[in-house]
């Protein structure tokens, strides 16, 4: 019906849900519990056994009347035991159904606990894998950054070397000439050529004017000093 209360999912709560002793019951504890719940059954079993023993003793003595009485008592005690069992089964039928239901619930709880443990274990492994992947990604990014920095530094060094090749070569020649490893014959040949050119210019002057020898020597000295500076 639409106006009725909403249905509760799952089984109804039981009064035995909080009874952990009932769940974790040992076999001997179960036997004693059954004896306490149905005391007439063990009583009928005891009476049947006693009647059988007395009938056996009467037969050993040769007392047939006593033996017959004990056999009748055994049959009566056995019938009493059967009636007690039937009455107990009828009386404790609901409790047995509840115990069966509780066993099923316990099995379901155990299965659910196993499933939850399995899920937690999978989640823990997933977290470990994610953390490992994050560490690997971080290391990869660091390596890429280092490689990029090294490439930038190499490119900058190559650019500086391309911009100043002449300065580096001139500096090397100046250092070699200072320490005496640069060849000095080239300088002497250049000085001779300059002197010869000056002599030819002074000799072949068409104006016929004579230059002052001191001035020509001064010019020659300035040229030689400029060559040395270069």
Curated annotation (Swiss-Prot):
Chain residue ranges for the region called Disordered: 1-20, 153-230
Cellular component GO terms, alphabetical: mitochondrial membrane
TM region positions: 40-59, 71-93
N-terminal signal peptide: none
Keyword set includes Cell membrane: no
Domain called HIG1: residue spans: 12-103
Keywords: Coiled coil, Membrane, Mitochondrion, Transmembrane, Transmembrane helix
Membrane topology: Multi-pass membrane protein
Coiled-coil intervals, chain numbering: 93-156
Listed Gene3D superfamilies: 6.10.140.1320
Compositional bias annotation for Pro residues: 1-12
Database matches in Pfam families: HIG_1_N (PF04588)
Subcellular locations according to the entry: Mitochondrion membrane
UniProt xrefs under InterPro entries: Hypoxia_induced_domain, RCF1
GO biological process: mitochondrial respirasome assembly
Compositionally biased spans, kind Basic and acidic residues: 185-196
Domain of life of the organism encoding this protein: Eukaryota
Primary location class: mitochondrion
Function according to Swiss-Prot or TrEMBL: Cytochrome c oxidase subunit which plays a role in assembly of respiratory supercomplexes.
Family: Belongs to the RCF1 family.
Assembly notes: Associates with the respiratory chain complex III/complex IV supercomplex.
Protein known as: Respiratory supercomplex factor 1, mitochondrial
Taxonomic source organism: Fusarium vanettenii (strain ATCC MYA-4622 / CBS 123669 / FGSC 9596 / NRRL 45880 / 77-13-4) (Fusarium solani subsp. pisi)
């Amino acid at each position: 019906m639409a106006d009725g209360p909403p249905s509760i999912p799952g089984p109804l709560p039981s009064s035995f849900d909080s009874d952990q002793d009932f769940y974790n019951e040992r076999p001997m504890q179960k036997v004693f519990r059954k004896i306490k719940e149905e005391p007439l059954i063990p009583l009928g079993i005891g009476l049947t056994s006693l009647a059988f023993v007395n009938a056996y003793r009467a037969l050993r003595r040769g007392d047939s009347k006593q033996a017959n009485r004990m056999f009748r008592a055994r049959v009566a005690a056995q019938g009493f035991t059967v009636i007690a069992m039937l009455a107990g089964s009828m009386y404790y039928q609901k409790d047995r159904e509840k115990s069966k239901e509780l066993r099923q619930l316990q099995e379901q709880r155990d299965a659910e606990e196993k499933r939850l443990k399995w899920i937690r274990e999978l989640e823990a492994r997933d977290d470990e894998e994610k953390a490992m992947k994050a560490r690997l990604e971080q290391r990869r990014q660091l390596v890429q950054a280092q490689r990029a920095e090294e490439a930038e530094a190499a490119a900058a060094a190559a650019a500086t070397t391309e911009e100043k090749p002449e300065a580096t070569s001139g500096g090397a020649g100046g250092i070699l000439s200072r320490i005496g490893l640069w060849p000095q014959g080239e300088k002497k040949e250049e000085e001779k050529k300059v002197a010869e050119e000056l002599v030819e210019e002074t000799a072949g002057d068409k104006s016929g004017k004579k230059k002052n020898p001191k001035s020509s020597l001064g010019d020659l000295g300035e040229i030689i000093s400029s060559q040395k500076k270069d």
